[in-house]
Amino acid sequence: MAFKFVVFAAALAYANAGLLGAPAVATYAAGPAVAYSARPAVSTAYINQAAPFLAHAAPLAVAHAAPYAVHAPAVGASHQSVVRSLGGNQAVSHYSKAVDSAFSSVRKFDTRITNDALLRAHAPVAVAHAAPVVVHLTAAHAPVVSSYAHAPLVSSYAAHAPLVSSYAAHAPLVSSYAAHAPVLSTAYAAHAPVVSSYAAPVVARTAAVGYSPAAVVSHTSFTGLGASYAW
């Protein structure tokens, strides 16, 4: 396409110059032998057309940067040792490891001790300990093993004897007085309950019916201080 454009531009240049119809060689007319004519002016035009050439633009040089190479080798070292005792009963092992790089540093240490407990067992030393005194110490007071009770106070207590009287309604006045009841000597300070007996009223039907007083009954009971009495 570029070559056609160059040819078209050259043809256009020829047309503008007016040289397309000009003869390639200049002609001379021979004059008569007698007459002399001045030499006509000869105009010579030379056109040197260089061969067309196509100029190609140089390709664009694209430079790619080489990748950044980081040369950072890591250096590692490890060490291990095992020390055993006579017979191999006990072993002590050491292990260490070191890794060094451009960005980090690591250290590791490991120590292990093993013992198979195969040593000779010594006889136990006979140690005589005195037998502990069998003494039972109790913080609480031991109960006294004895029967303890407040014995009734044998003392004469003048308690009022219960009034035992027979009462009849509008009957012939017959008063029966009972003898004093035996005084019960106890350790109870309260008065003995008064027990009063009342005879049933005498219903007199006729005068022929005789009247006899009811028997005097006295009941006494006491309960307290672990004792109970009744009669």
Swiss-Prot record:
Disulfide bonds: none
Pfam families: Cuticle_3
Domain of life: Eukaryota
Sequence repeat residue numbers: 130-133, 199-202
Keywords: Cuticle, Repeat, Signal
Written domain comment of the UniProt record: The tetrapeptide (A-A-P-[AV]) repeats found throughout the protein are also present in many proteins constituting the protective envelope of other species.
Role of this protein: Component of the cuticle of Tenebrio molitor.
Source organism: Tenebrio molitor
Leader sequence segment: 1-17
Protein name, per record: Cuticle protein LPCP-23
UniProt key word Magnesium: no
GO MF, one annotated term: structural constituent of cuticle
PANTHER family the UniProt entry points to: LARVAL/PUPAL CUTICLE PROTEIN H1C-LIKE PROTEIN-RELATED (PTHR39068), MIP24391P (PTHR39068:SF2)
